Amino acid sequence: MGRKWNNIKDKKASKDANTSRIYAKFGREIYVAAKQGEPDPESNQALRVVLERAKTYNVPRTIIDRAVEKAKGGSEENYDELRYEGFGPNGAMVIVDTLTNNVNRTAADVRAAFSKNSGNMGVNGSVAYMFDATAVIGLEGKTSDEVLEILMEADVDARDILEEEDSVIVYAEPDQFHSVQSALKGAGVEEFTVAELTMLAQSDVTLPEDAQVQFEKMVDALEDLEDVQQVYHNVDLGE
């Protein structure tokens, strides 16, 4: 699982060099979370998760404040949260999460990104059963044993705790996201390298080189769509 997260992290770091794109996606996600509940992260857990994620991407405060103020101002702009599932080359499994104000446009765009890159959209539930919703928290400056002790003392459960290069990665149930962070903050951890609610594949597949090239093009095409927030898959992209 650890190598899987590094796989995702490295890919995201490459793609998210386009800061304007990632900031725009966060702005939309923050607005939706703030609009659906209270615009206060203390009472709105969904908003708190998004803001914690935004910190790890260095999203500017101005973008965060603008999105929250837009929600406070009673903007009539509404977005639907939709999930698409599909297959890439060689049957690779893909989940695409979107926020859209035009369902027909988004469905057509996602379908085209699949079909133009040797993939195809599946029906609801066709691949999601092979993924687990997971909270992933990363930090530096502690060992895995130290993190385990901190979580045990706070009576917080984790699925797994792994050391990866200079970081420790904690994998937990989604509803433990805030509990894990709170326990670590209480032990002096001030910054997190990773703070995600993600879908992790239960097992990875390795593609032949030509299929992997095509698959990466498909993922890039999906991630470049304005309405797409997250793309999850079960392909080991290698180092």
Curated annotation (Swiss-Prot):
Keyword Transcription: yes
Domain of life: Bacteria
Tagged with keyword Transcription: yes
Gene3D superfamilies according to UniProt: 1.10.10.200, 3.30.70.980
Alphabetized UniProt keyword annotations: Cytoplasm, DNA-binding, Transcription, Transcription regulation
Subcellular compartments: Cytoplasm
GO molecular function term, any single one: DNA binding
Main location: cytoplasm
Transmembrane intervals: none
Pfam families per the UniProt record, alphabetical: TACO1_YebC_N, Transcrip_reg
GO biological process: regulation of DNA-templated transcription
PANTHER family: TRANSLATIONAL ACTIVATOR OF CYTOCHROME C OXIDASE 1
Protein family membership: Belongs to the TACO1 family. YeeN subfamily.
UniProt name for this protein: Probable transcriptional regulatory protein BCG9842_B4761
Species lineage: Bacteria, Bacillati, Bacillota, Bacilli, Bacillales
